[in-house]
Amino acid sequence: MHKSISYGRELRLLTPSHFQTVFSNPPVKAVTAHVTMLATPNELGHPRIGVTVSKKRAKRAVDRNRIKRQIRETFRLRQHKIPAFDIVIIAKQGIVEQDNAALRDTLNYLWRKLAKRCEQYQSRS
């Protein structure tokens, strides 16, 4: 059977309480100058993501949407390599200056780093 690489509703953090659970005490983090990823284990058997790009970091809606689109696309392609964690991605200062290729490289690096740290966390507990 072939694994789906879609990005459906079940792969997203939808409510403020989902986000708050991750923000309250994330055991796993992956950080670069432009992006922070926070992760907390879930019991669902698959990862979920939530994306935050504030107006302070990206003034124009077109920039915020471009950043969110890149994040969702890199997650969609890597979702089967990521353990069952709820993940919040936070855009930081200067992310707007990154073009799509640089942003994609940064995100791919962070997904690898996060997946490795999540697996290490699971093996410890």
From Swiss-Prot:
GO terms for molecular function: 3'-tRNA processing endoribonuclease activity; ribonuclease P activity; tRNA binding. It catalyses: Endonucleolytic cleavage of RNA, removing 5'-extranucleotides from tRNA precursor. It is an enzyme of class 3 (hydrolase). Its EC number is 3.1.26.5. GO terms for cellular component: ribonuclease P complex. It comes from the Bacteria. The keyword Repeat does not apply. The keyword Hydrolase applies. Keywords: Endonuclease, Hydrolase, Nuclease, RNA-binding, tRNA processing. GO terms for biological process: tRNA 5'-leader removal. Belongs to the RnpA family. Consists of a catalytic RNA component (M1 or rnpB) and a protein subunit. PANTHER family: RIBONUCLEASE P PROTEIN COMPONENT (PTHR33992:SF1). RNaseP catalyzes the removal of the 5'-leader sequence from pre-tRNA to produce the mature 5'-terminus. It can also cleave other RNA substrates such as 4.5S RNA. The protein component plays an auxiliary but essential role in vivo by binding to the 5'-leader sequence and broadening the substrate specificity of the ribozyme. This is Ribonuclease P protein component.
